[in-house]
A protein has these predicted regions:
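A short beta-strand-loop micro-motif that forms or neighbors metal/cofactor-
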Residues: 121-136
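Accessory C-terminal helicase-associated subdomains
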Residues: 32-35, 39, 107-110, 133-242
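Helix-hairpin-helix
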Residues: 84, 101-123, 142-144
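Conserved short internal alpha-helix adjacent to the catalytic or cofactor-binding core
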Residues: 10, 62-68, 73, 77-107
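Amphipathic alpha-helical transducer elements in NTP-driven molecular machines
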Residues: 11, 21-28, 40, 50-53, ...
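Helicase P-loop NTPase motor core
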Residues: 1-66, 89-94, 125, 147, ...
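A residue-level signal for conserved active-site and pocket-lining positions in enzyme catalytic cores
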Residues: 27, 45, 84, 112, ...
Length: 242
């Protein structure tokens, strides 16, 4: 039995939302309506699973409400979310070498650090993007042993790029999750942490849907630009109203 020694206060309100976006917008609007004469840091939102923070974070960002995560990590700062965004970035722009380096052996494909270093040296010597070398490894004798694995990776990227031209963004993302093997890797591990990470990977689709709802002509490039704005947030300032 739950009880409190505090004096009687406002009754608890129950709101049955139609979706996680509706739920997040309700929370946001409620905070805004109650914020007169208060600081945003006077409010707290409790959620049960990490993935649930995504919709609330997105709603706060659109409404200009400052926030910070206590005892956890911002949705777009989570490694698995960064990994999937890296895939999307490379599919959108093959010249994105930083993201390419992040995903080329993630999940493991037998493409080791030495192979990547050799590919980088070849790219630098030829004055071409790293992806150009990786997608044509048989032209470089030093990459011959890893050529099949490198080709298999670039086939995944190219197939996903073709699907981008044919499918709506949410369906395209479903294919990326499957074809890259990233979601399968997490599901096969089966531990609690991996299941949570898999849930976060799926939750990224909600961000795509939210972006589409607020954009007349949604594109992958546009989505990535919006996410870049979300993630370009300064570290927590203890004196800030968040």
């Amino acid at each position: 039995k739950l009880w409190t020694e505090n004096a009687a206060g406002d009754q608890i309100t129950v709101y049955e939302a139609s979706s996680e976006t509706d739920e997040a917008n309700f929370v946001t609007n409620r905070i805004i309506s109650m914020s007169k004469g208060k600081n945003f840091k006077d409010f707290a939102v409790l959620y049960r699973t990490n993935a649930q923070s995504n919709a609330v974070e997105n709603s706060f960002k659109r409404s200009g409400i400052p926030y910070r995560i206590i005892g956890g990590t911002r949705f777009f700062d989570r490694a698995e979310v960064k990994d999937m965004l890296a895939y999307l970035c490379v599919i959108n722009n093959r010249a994105d070498e930083l993201r390419l380096q992040r995903i080329i052996n993630n999940p493991p494909r037998g493409i080791g650090g030495k192979t990547l270093e050799m590919a980088e040296r070849q790219a630098a010597a030829a004055g071409v993007p790293l992806y150009t070398v990786v997608s044509d490894p048989y032209s470089y004798p030093s990459l011959e042993k890893a050529a099949a694995k490198l080709m298999a990776f670039t086939v995944i990227i190219e197939e996903c790029a073709e699907l981008l031209q044919k499918l709506p963004l949410p369906d395209f993302y479903e294919e990326v999750m499957t074809r890259t093997g990233y979601l399968q890797m997490l599901e096969e591990k089966g531990d609690v942490e991996s299941r949570t990470r898999a849930e976060n990977v799926r939750e990224l689709k909600s961000s795509i849907l939210s972006y589409m709802e607020n954009t007349e002509t949604p594109t992958l490039a546009g989505f990535l630009e919006e996410i870049a704005l979300y993630t370009d947030i300064e570290q927590y300032d203890p004196d800030a109203d968040a």
